[in-house]
Amino acid sequence: MEGCETRGQLYYHPAYLFAIIFQGTSGYLTFPILFIILKKYAFKVYYHPNLVFLMMLNVVSCLLLGGLTAWSATNFFLNLMIKPSPCDLLLKTYFCSKIRGTFLFAFCLVTTSHAGILLERSWATYSVKNYERQGRALGTILAIVAVAVAATAIFILLLPEDGEEMITTCLTFSASKSIGSRVYVMFFVQLLLDAVISIVHLVLYRYNKNIDKHGSTSLSEQFQRNENVKTLKQVTPLLILSNVTIGVYIFIVSVFRLYKDYLPPNWYEIIAANLFIMPHMPFMFTSLILVELWLGKKRQDRIHKDMMASQDVPLDDQFHIAMENWDVHFQSRLKAQARANRKPLSANWTSSTLITKFKKRQTTVAVISIPPSPS
C-alpha cells in the first residue's frame, strides 16, 4: 500500500504534470494542423496513386498518435479530479493494453510506411519511362505489407505484458517492468531502419535531381523525376526528425536507466515522461509537412511570377515579335528549299544545254554535207 501511495504521488508532482500537459497539448494541436493540410493542399497534389496510398498511412499514423496522446492526457486529468486517493489514480495495464498496442502500432507504422515510400520511389526511378501508366497494385501491396509488419512487431513486443502491473498513464512504456526493455529494442531497430532509409532517400533524391538537368528525356520522364524529387524532398525532413528524436531519447533515457536505482523515488518516471518525445511526434510531423507544403507553394508562386514578368511585353510588341519571327522562319525555309532545289535545277539546265548544242551541231553538219545540185 505504501508503494502504491508513493507511485500515486506522481500525479501531483509539478514536473510530471507539466509533461502530461505538454503531451496533451501536442496531441490536440495535431488535428487543426492536419485539417489545414487536408483543406489547403490535399486536393492540389497530383501524385501517383501508389504514392498516395503510402502517404495516407502517414496521415492515419499521425491521427492515431495524436488522438491517443490527447485521450491519455484527458483521462489523466479526469482521474485526478474524480479519484480520491493516490492508489485509485493508478491504472492496471490490462485497462490500457489495446490503447498501448495501438499507439505503438501507429508509431511503428510511421517507419514501415516510410520504407514503403522508399521502395515505391525506387521502382518509380527504375521504371521511369512507363511508371505513369502502371496501376495501383504496387501501392496496395506495399501498404498491406507495411501494416502487417507493424502489427506483427507490436504483437510480439506485447506478448510478455503483465496485465496486473500498475501504471500512471496508458502511454507509460519506459518505466514498465514487463515490456520496458523490449520497447527500447523496438525504438533502436526503428532508429537503424530510419537511418538506412534516410541515406537511400538522399541518394535517390540526388540521382533524380541531377540525371536530367538538360531536359534530354521525354516529357513523361521529366514529370516522373520531378515527382520523385518533390516527394523525396518532403519525406526526408520527417526521417531526419524521426532519427534525431528517437536517437536522443534512447541515448538520454538509457543513461538515466543505468542509474535508476540511485535516483529518488519517482524521479526516473518524471525524467522519462519529460523526455518521452514520441507523443509529440505527430505534432512535429504535421507541422513539418505544413511548412514544407507552404514553402513549396511559395516557391511555385515566385517562379510563376518571374515567368510572367519575363513575358511582360505590350500587345503590339508581341504582334510585331510574332510577325518578325514568322518572316525570319519563312525566309530561312525558303532559302533552304532553294538550296535543296538548286543542284537538280543546275543539272537539268546543263543536260538540256548540251542536248540543244548537240542538235545544233547535227544540223550544221547535215547542212554542210549536202551535195550541190546539178545545174
From Swiss-Prot:
<dbReference type="GO" id="GO:0004984">
    <property type="term" value="F:olfactory receptor activity"/>
</dbReference>
<feature type="transmembrane region" description="Helical">
    <location>
        <begin position="51"/>
        <end position="71"/>
    </location>
</feature>
<feature type="transmembrane region" description="Helical">
    <location>
        <begin position="138"/>
        <end position="158"/>
    </location>
</feature>
<feature type="transmembrane region" description="Helical">
    <location>
        <begin position="275"/>
        <end position="295"/>
    </location>
</feature>
<keyword id="KW-1133">Transmembrane helix</keyword>
<feature type="transmembrane region" description="Helical">
    <location>
        <begin position="236"/>
        <end position="256"/>
    </location>
</feature>
<dbReference type="Pfam" id="PF10292">
    <property type="entry name" value="7TM_GPCR_Srab"/>
</dbReference>
<dbReference type="GO" id="GO:0050907">
    <property type="term" value="P:detection of chemical stimulus involved in sensory perception"/>
</dbReference>
<feature type="transmembrane region" description="Helical">
    <location>
        <begin position="17"/>
        <end position="37"/>
    </location>
</feature>
<protein>
    <recommendedName>
        <fullName>Serpentine receptor class alpha-39</fullName>
    </recommendedName>
</protein>
<keyword id="KW-0472">Membrane</keyword>
<dbReference type="GO" id="GO:0016020">
    <property type="term" value="C:membrane"/>
</dbReference>
<comment type="similarity">
    <text>Belongs to the nematode receptor-like protein sra family.</text>
</comment>
<feature type="transmembrane region" description="Helical">
    <location>
        <begin position="99"/>
        <end position="119"/>
    </location>
</feature>
<keyword id="KW-0812">Transmembrane</keyword>
<dbReference type="InterPro" id="IPR019408">
    <property type="entry name" value="7TM_GPCR_serpentine_rcpt_Srab"/>
</dbReference>
<feature type="transmembrane region" description="Helical">
    <location>
        <begin position="183"/>
        <end position="203"/>
    </location>
</feature>
<dbReference type="InterPro" id="IPR051080">
    <property type="entry name" value="Nematode_rcpt-like_serp_alpha"/>
</dbReference>
